[in-house]
From Swiss-Prot:
SMART domains: Elp3
Similarity comment: Belongs to the radical SAM superfamily.
SUPFAM superfamilies membership: Radical SAM enzymes (SSF102114)
Enzyme Commission number, as recorded: 2.1.1.332
Chief location of this protein within or outside the cell: cytoplasm
Cofactor needs: [4Fe-4S] cluster
InterPro entries the record matches: Bacteriochlorophyll_C8_MT, Cobalamin-bd, Elp3/MiaA/NifB-like_rSAM, Methylthiotransferase_CS, rSAM, rSAM_horseshoe, Tetrapyrrole_Bchl_Biosynth_MTs
UniProt xrefs under CDD domains: Radical_SAM, radical_SAM_B12_BD
Source organism per UniProt: Chlorobaculum tepidum (strain ATCC 49652 / DSM 12025 / NBRC 103806 / TLS)
Protein name as it appears in the record: Bacteriochlorophyllide d C-8(2)-methyltransferase
Amino acid sequence: MDDDSNQKPLFHMALGVLTSLTPPQHHIELVDEHFHDKINYDGDYDMVGITSRTIEATRAYEIADEFRKRGKTVVLGGLHISFNPEEAAAHADCIVVGEADNLWTTLLDDVANNRLKERYDSKDFPPVKAITPLDYARIAKASKRTKVDGTKSIPIYVTRGCPFNCSFCVTPNFTGKQYRVQDPKLLKHQIEEAKKYFFKANGKNSKPWFMLTDENLGINKKKLWESLDLLKECDITFSVFLSINFLEDPTTVKKLVDAGCNFVLAGLESIKQSTLEAYNKGHVNSAEKYSKIIEDCRKAGLNIQGNFLFNPAIDTFEDIDELVQFVKKNHIFMPIFQIITPYPGTQMYHEYRESGLITIEDWEKYNALHLVIKSDRYEPLLFQYKVLKSYVEVYTWKEILLRTLYNPRKLINLVTSIAFKKHLAAQLKAFERNHKMNPAMLSGVKPVMNG
C-alpha cells in the first residue's frame, strides 16, 4: 500500500487501543513512520513502545536498538513480536505477547515503579472479554494527524476475534476465536468523537469515511444487522471486511448500502476451482458465483473489492492471465493481487517451515509481492514479475475509467485507484531496474512439471 494511499487509515489500530488504555496521568506521544513522522531519539521518554507487523519487524528492531543505545527502556509488542518472542527479545528490555488490553496498565505501573519484567503474556492475565473503546480525543492529542475529509479513512472497530481457522490467517492465533462485539452506545459515542477530532467537511454532502478494521464483522448475522442499523443512524460512509458468502443475502446487502457502506473487501482468493478447493473454499465458491454476487451488489449500490492470491505450486501463468481477464470483465473495484505468504503465527507458516518450504525469512520481503516459499515450477523472480506485471495491467487508465464508470461511489473509486496505480507503477519500475527484467522474459514461460 502506498504511504499516501487514501485507503490507509489515519492511525494504526494497535496504537489507538494502547493510547485509549493508558491512564490519564501518563503523557503519550504517537509517532508513525507510515506518515513520515520523524523519530526523536533524544526525547525525554520513560518508555518507548513499538508495535509492528511482520514486514515492519526489521525496522522496528532498528528503532529499538537505537533507543536502547541511548539508554531508553524499550517495549516491543504486536503481531510479529507475539509469534517471534525470542527473536524480538534481543532488541528490547521487555516484550508483550498477545492482546495488551488486560496487561497494559500493569506494565505501565511496573515501569513507573522500576520493576518492569522481561515479558508480559496476555495468557497470564484475565481473558479480554470486552473491546476497548477508542478515545479519539486522546489519540488526536497524542498524534500528529490532522483532520481529513471524506476521501481518507478514520479507523474504528466493532468486533474482535474470529472462530474460523483459515491456514493463511493469523487472527485466531492472536486476537483469539472468541467473538466479541462492542456495546452499541459506546460505538455511537466513538463515531461522534471521531467526527469531532478527525473530520472536516468538504462540501455540503461530505460525510466522514470510516475503515472498519474488524477481522470478520459478518460472523453473526444478527449482530451484523444490529451494527449496520446503528451505523445507519450515524450519517457516515464506511468500508468493511466480509466473507463474499454473506453478500448472497439481499437483506444484508441492502442494510450495508442503507448504512453507508461504500465497499466491502472480500477474500475471493482465486477463480480456479481446484485452487479454491486447495483453500477449502471450493465447496461454497466458484467464478460464476463471484460474478453474480458482484453484479447483484453493484446494482444495489455496493462495491466489492476482491482480494486474490497466487501460489506457484498451484497457479500457472495462464491462470494468472485468466484472472486478469475475469477482473476486467467484471470491473472489480480496486482489485488486490498477492502472492501467497506464510506469515508467522499462521498454520501455514508452521506447516511450511516444518516441511522446509520457506526459503526466505527476510521480513522486509513479507509484503505479499515477494515469493518467500519454495518454487519448483517457476523461477521465483519470474513468478514475482508475472504477478506484478498483471497487477499493473488491471490498473491501466482504461481499466480505472471503466471501473469508475460501471461501479457506484465513483469518487472513492477514482481517487483510490489512482493512488494504487502510482504505487504499482513505481514498484514495477524499481523491480525491472533492480533485477534487469523486461516483458520479453515472460514470453513462452511454462511451468516445470514434476513427476
